[in-house]
Amino acid sequence: MTLNSLPIFLVLISGIFCQYDYGPADDYGYDPFGPSTAVCAPECNCPLSYPTAMYCDNLKLKTIPIVPSGIKYLYLRNNMIEAIEENTFDNVTDLQWLILDHNHLENSKIKGRVFSKLKNLKKLHINYNNLTEAVGPLPKTLDDLQLSHNKITKVNPGALEGLVNLTVIHLQNNQLKTDSISGAFKGLNSLLYLDLSFNQLTKLPTGLPHSLLMLYFDNNQISNIPDEYFQGFKTLQYLRLSHNKLTDSGIPGNVFNITSLVELDLSFNQLKSIPTVSENLENFYLQVNKINKFPLSSFCKVVGPLTYSKITHLRLDGNNLTRADLPQEMYNCLRVAADISLE
């Protein structure tokens, strides 16, 4: 990974583990900021230390308050908001973050082009609502779209078209099927992070951008992977396919031999053998399958002073393997492995 890509990589990593850590006003049992600024909706908090942020969380609001001009960061989490009128944000053209998690929003009650009119919007989070399809149209400035834990069954063709700055999409925990998203992400050439876990996918979708760094398909119903599916993914580093229905016959020989890959999770499937992976792979999760043999060729094509597997963590617990099944020469191939779990 280059130094130039490290800052955005760290942002993505923090998004994985702290998806809802939006800022300094998270769910305090007291007011950590003191008095609000004079320019603020009376029921909300616009702290003096963060004068362009308005916090309206946990207020049982049914409608969005009037948002004063100059607000850039708007938090409306954990309310009872059901609708957004088209003119709701006409006064806040500088809005950059709009956080609407844990409300009662439905697509039919999000009116017109309410989001696309926000020409500076970068983050739109509508996790834990009642959406049945991806919202849109959206502004081209958007870089972070989170729609997880809804009831989304489709991403309409063109819904994400033109979002050239979009780097993060969360669509996990919805009701998406493969046909309803194939081609939906085409042209998103800045996309680095895509989470489609906990849906109803039976196949891998087509048209994913090759810019992806992190790709999550865990907890679906995927049984096979097309040959050369990941060909062209030159920067893919994290791939999760755990809790699916993968078998040996559904995995072409070298489909996971991706030189950029750092972490691969194939745990909780129905594999009997270990797929071939790149010698650059560092973390490999295969626990709870039906694996009964340990071919070194899955990890090392050739073993020598400078040619060996870079795997540091290998999980094989919950399979049909014991220490006695591991070949002695394994330690030449997996010489940097710090942890090999079998039990």
UniProtKB/Swiss-Prot annotation:
This is Lumican. Binds to laminin. One of its GO terms (molecular function) is collagen binding. LRR repeats lie at residues 70-91, 94-117, 120-140, 141-162, 165-186, 190-211, 212-232, 235-255, 260-281, 282-301, 310-330. SUPFAM superfamilies: L domain-like. The modification Sulfotyrosine is found at Y20, Y22. It is found in: Secreted, Extracellular space, Extracellular matrix. Cornea and other tissues. The gene is LUM. Transmembrane segments: none annotated. Residues 1-18 form the signal peptide. The modification Pyrrolidone carboxylic acid is found at Q19.
